[in-house]
Amino acid sequence: MSQPVSHKVDGLTRFRVDFAYDGTDYTGWAKQPGLKTVQGDLLAAMTTIFGPTENDFGMRIAGRTDAGVHAANQVAHVDLSAAQLKRLGRNPNVVARLNHMMSESIRIHEFKPAAPGFDARFSAIYRRYRYQISDNFAQKDPQQMRYVLNLTYALDPVAMNEAAQLLLGLNDFASFCKTRAGATTIRDLKRIKVRRNAQNI
């Protein structure tokens, strides 16, 4: 990892973390007492490398995920002090060290100094989600069980795609999620497409 030369926040150096995870065995992203979460595992590994933190290293993520949800291209940022960075010593390869400490369900791809003004949550221009459904129950692939919803009845992707277009634009999606104090349920859905490929919808 190169020496940090960019974004400073309150005297701390901000880093961008790019990573992916299989959320099957986790109760979501956000750390929760007594529960296995993605953030909890990442914080534990970072604490081993950088030492104790009172504010979770200022960690913020582009978008939280719920229990069992996966992320292919997740982004977070953390803020580290000079003292914490000094603990890297002669082995500054943070990516390799974090991956060595964590379950293979979480893989860090990059850990690098953030660009000036970068904020993992507010710098995100959009977020993309993919849902996979199989209506060919007899041919379901056991290797894909964690990533595909398997149904026992046939679906009509053409009709589904037509209906899905009604969700486009600025709408209140409160009925799709749990209510959180201070959180908005209004989202601007830019694009949605339902199609059948070789195996799934």
PLM regions: where:
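Structured-RNA-binding interfaces characteristic of tRNA pseudouridine synthases
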Residues: 2-201
